[in-house]
């Protein structure tokens, strides 16, 4: 617990390079020239997917860190690093900043003076529905999962960008710069299946009050969707292993590393 409290304090005091806490308690991350999230490609020193400001998954993870610390502090009778009242206020801020009319979440929130928000439909929003301490109510989290299922889910993982987006680039091919431009702009990543499954099952259980028939149907549909990952892919690239990425459209060609640890870990977690 002391280590966790110390980490929180370091972020709040601005001791982490390019990271600071704002007046709402959330984290302001990076600059226009830095890439501090997993979507980290730069070409000639410029980010391909600029995500400075308030990336949705960073804020969801940070909220969970504070909520966990609050839970531990209550159990240990320690000074509370983030009270229940503060957490409730953060949930309100999160909804106001990120929730869009169609039920999806912004990928990045920024103030207008900092360039304005990024409303791209990406899988990062699933972290807000998947983590143990929910920053969204189940009904709103259900909308996030619905958008991901309709726009991002494929038989081999989740797209990094909706095909409806003008910047969608599904083919990972060409020069290093050309591949870099598509790496997080539409290619499919299997590791995201773990996050999707967490969000799907957690949300379905909450909304359906744990009804076994509903849960069984959701699990069956999910497994049917991703079955080609096992019936086809495990014998087409590196025998018995899962590739790093796939094309964002059919025929879902595998690319990148032919046996990727995080792909396999994410898929195994989903199962």
What are these regions (language model features)?
Residues 1-41, 55-59, 63, 189-203, ...:
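Aromatic-rich carbohydrate-recognition surfaces in CAZymes
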Residues 9-12, 16-23, 28, 61-172, ...:
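Catalytic cores of carbohydrate-active enzymes
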Residues 32-54, 111-113, 172-183, 244-254:
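Acidic/His metal-coordination segments adjacent to aromatic residues that form catalytic metal sites
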Residues 54-57, 122-129, 178-191, 197, ...:
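Substrate-binding groove/exosite segments of carbohydrate-active enzymes
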Residues 74-81, 142, 199-220:
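Acidic, serine/threonine/proline-rich low-complexity intrinsically disordered regions
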Residues 116, 179-188, 201-214, 254-259:
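Short, contiguous acidic/charged loop-to-helix segments that flank catalytic cores in large enzymes
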Residues 158-193:
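Generic long, charged, amphipathic alpha-helical segments
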């Amino acid at each position: 617990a002391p280590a966790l409290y110390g980490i929180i304090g370091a972020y709040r005091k601005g001791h982490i390079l390019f990271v600071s806490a704002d007046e709402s308690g959330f984290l302001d991350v990076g600059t226009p020239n830095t890439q501090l999230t997993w979507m980290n490609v730069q070409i000639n020193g410029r980010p391909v997917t600029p995500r400075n400001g308030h990336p949705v998954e960073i804020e969801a993870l940070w909220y969970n860190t504070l909520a966990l610390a609050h839970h531990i502090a209550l159990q240990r009778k320690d000074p509370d690093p983030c009270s229940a009242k503060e957490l409730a206020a953060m949930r309100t801020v999160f909804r106001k900043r990120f929730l869009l009319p169609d039920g999806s979440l912004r990928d990045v929130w920024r103030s207008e003076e900092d360039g304005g928000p990024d409303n791209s439909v990406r899988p990062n929003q699933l972290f807000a529905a998947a983590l143990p301490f929910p920053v969204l109510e189940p009904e709103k989290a259900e909308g996030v999962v619905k958008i991901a299922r309709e726009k991002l889910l494929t038989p081999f993982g989740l797209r990094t960008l909706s095909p409806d987006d003008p910047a969608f680039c599904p083919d990972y091919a060409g020069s290093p710069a050309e591949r870099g431009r598509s790496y997080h702009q539409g290619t499919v990543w299997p590791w995201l299946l773990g996050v999707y499954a967490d969000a799907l099952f957690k949300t379905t259980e909450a909304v359906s009050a744990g009804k076994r028939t509903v849960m069984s149907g959701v699990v069956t549909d999910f497994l049917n969707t991703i079955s080609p990952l096992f019936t086809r892919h495990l014998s087409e690239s590196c025998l018995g292993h899962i590739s790093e990425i796939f094309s964002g459209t059919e025929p879902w060609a595998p690319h990148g590393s032919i046996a990727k640890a995080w792909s396999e870990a994410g898929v195994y977690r989903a199962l």
